[in-house]
UniProtKB/Swiss-Prot annotation:
Entry similarity comment: Belongs to the band 7/mec-2 family. Flotillin subfamily.
Gene coding for it: FLOT4
Broad class of the protein's primary localization: membrane
Species classification: Eukaryota, Viridiplantae, Streptophyta, Embryophyta, Tracheophyta
Protein name: Flotillin-like protein 4
Record keywords: Cell membrane, Coiled coil, Membrane, Nodulation
SS bond list: none
Stored Pfam families: Band_7
GO cellular component: apical plasma membrane; caveola; plasma membrane
Organism: Medicago truncatula
InterPro entries: Band_7 (IPR001107), Band_7/SPFH_dom_sf (IPR036013), Flotillin_fam (IPR027705)
Coiled coil (UniProt feature): 235-255, 305-325
Tissue: Expressed in roots and nodules. Primarily expressed in vascular tissues. Upon induction of nodulation, expansion of expression in the root cortex in the region of elongating root hairs, which will eventually become colonized by bacteria. Expressed in the infection zone in nodules.
Length: 475
């Protein structure tokens, strides 16, 4: 089933394949999974918080908080989905939760401030409440989008703010009267002051006018003298510049004449120098031609001999390299053969050791299995005989042929001797009951000496159901 949430909603999915919860805008809801939808739009909560200042003065703080999930933080959305989304945003549960946090933080903060501080620092008080409430709401994934704190209101029976307002009004009225009186006083004083200042300023202006007129006349004379002086200086400068220009012109004419003569001499010398250079170039080319000819004659023979020697040396070097490579290859082959032989020997020994280890393990496992089987067998036998250890021991000795083995050993020991043999009989040799019972009597005749011999050699007594030895024999 494919589900899509609206623009202001989220899907909360739980169930198979999801470790905790999953938030999504759209998703497939698989069998074994469940989902719910929660809205992200904020909600307005209006409260009238009753608090008490540090002077134990109660007051009412009307406030409107706009609170909703923090949409820009995935961790906060997960907290909101787990803790708040199962409840309706407008339900009493959510409202009581938010109201409890706001009232608690407001009362704690108000208790640390005086009424005057709360009244005059409403903005700071609001910021403190906002910060502390937001800190508590973070653990539920909620964010305060807006918080409006209205004017503080008196609790019925406590008219602090009304008295404070009356006080402010009276202070304002008194201040207004004082301001009116001060304004009248300032008006009268100002009028007289203005008249005096007018007379003073008129006299001052007359004096300053005379001074300025004399200053202007002196400045005019100084300016005339200054202008005449500057004109004379300018004339002298112009005459000096004309003389300097004439001198420079004469110098330049002399330099130009000298340069022309030098150029003529340099031209003549350059022609002679170029002639000598060309003649030297001709001689050098002749010498190079002769040198190249001699090189061609003598170096050709030397080059041939050099190439021959180089080829012979290269051949000797190549032969020695090949011989060295052959010896190296032979040594490598021998080393690889020895290594292969060592690897084969090591592998054979490893396989033999592993086979022996496997045989020992299997033998040990067989012994363990046999021991377990014998334990089960003895346990079953002991249970069948009513946990009679003596009966189990005798059964095992009889079943294992121990008595026969003991008799055989005793017979071997007394072979060739004349042992004393006791024979018990019932004294009825000539009675008419001979026949089948005779064989049974013979068996019973054999048992007493066998039991006695076993007792003498091992100290073990026969079971009660097979007979009892006389006391004299035991002693």
């Amino acid at each position: 089933m494919y589900k899509v949430a609206k623009a202001s909603q989220y899907l909360v999915i739980t169930g198979i394949g999801i470790k905790d919860i999953k938030l999504a805008k759209k998703a497939w809801i698989l069998p074994g999974q469940s989902y719910s939808v929660f809205d992200l739009s904020p909600v307005n909560y209006t409260f009238e918080v009753q608090a008490m200042s540090a002077e134990k003065l109660p007051f009412v703080l009307p406030a409107v908080f706009t609170i909703g999930p923090r949409v820009d933080d995935k961790e906060s959305l997960l907290k909101y989905a787990k803790l708040i989304s199962p409840h309706d945003k407008l339900s009493n549960h959510v409202k009581e939760l938010v109201q409890g946090i706001i009232e608690g933080e407001t009362r704690v903060l108000a208790a640390s401030m005086t009424m005057e501080e709360v009244f005059r620092g409403t903005k700071e008080f609001k910021q403190e409440v906002f910060g502390k409430v937001q800190l508590e709401l973070n653990q539920f994934g909620l964010l305060i989008y807006n918080a409006n704190v209205k004017q503080l209101v008196d609790v019925p029976g406590h008219e602090y703010f009304s008295y404070l307002g009356q006080k402010t009004q009276m202070e304002a009225a008194n201040q207004a009267r004082v301001d009116v009186s001060e304004a009248k006083m300032k008006g009268e004083i100002g009028s007289k002051l203005r008249e005096g200042q007018t007379l003073q300023n008129a006299a001052k202006i007359d004096a300053e006018t005379k001074i300025i007129a004399m200053q202007r006349a002196g400045e005019g004379d100084k300016e005339g003298i200054k202008v005449r002086t500057e004109v004379k200086v300018f004339e002298n400068q112009r005459e000096a510049e004309v003389a300097e220009a004439n001198s420079e012109l004469a110098k330049k004419k002399a330099a130009w004449t000298k340069a022309a003569q030098v150029a003529e001499v340099e031209a003549a010398k350059a022609v002679a120098l170029r002639d000598a250079e060309l003649q030297g170039e001709v001689e050098r080319m002749n010498a190079l031609t002769t040198t190249e000819k001699l090189k061609a004659e003598f170096l050709s023979k030397a080059s041939v001999q050099y190439e021959t020697k180089v080829q012979e040396a290269n051949w000797e070097l190549y032969k020695k390299q090949k011989e060295a490579e052959a010896i190296l290859y032979e040594k490598k082959a021998e080393a690889e053969a020895q290594k292969a032989l060592a690897d084969a020997t090591f592998y054979a020994r490893t396989q033999a050791a592993e086979a022996e280890l496997y045989a020992k393990k299997k033998e040990a496992e067989g012994i363990v299995t046999l021991g377990n089987a014998q334990g089960v067998y003895l346990s079953a036998l002991l249970n069948a005989l009513g946990n009679n250890y003596t009966a189990v021991r005798d059964f095992l000795m009889i079943n294992g042929g121990m008595f026969q083995e003991i008799a055989k050993i005793n017979a071997e020991a007394v072979r060739g001797l004349e042992p004393k043999i006791s024979i018990w009989t019932n004294g009825g040799d000539n009675s008419g009951g001979e026949g089948a019972m005779k064989e049974v009597a013979g068996v019973y005749k054999m048992l007493p000496p066998l039991f006695k011999t076993v007792h003498e050699q091992t100290g073990m007594l026969p079971p009660a159901w097979m007979g009892v030895l006389p006391d004299k024999n035991l002693n």
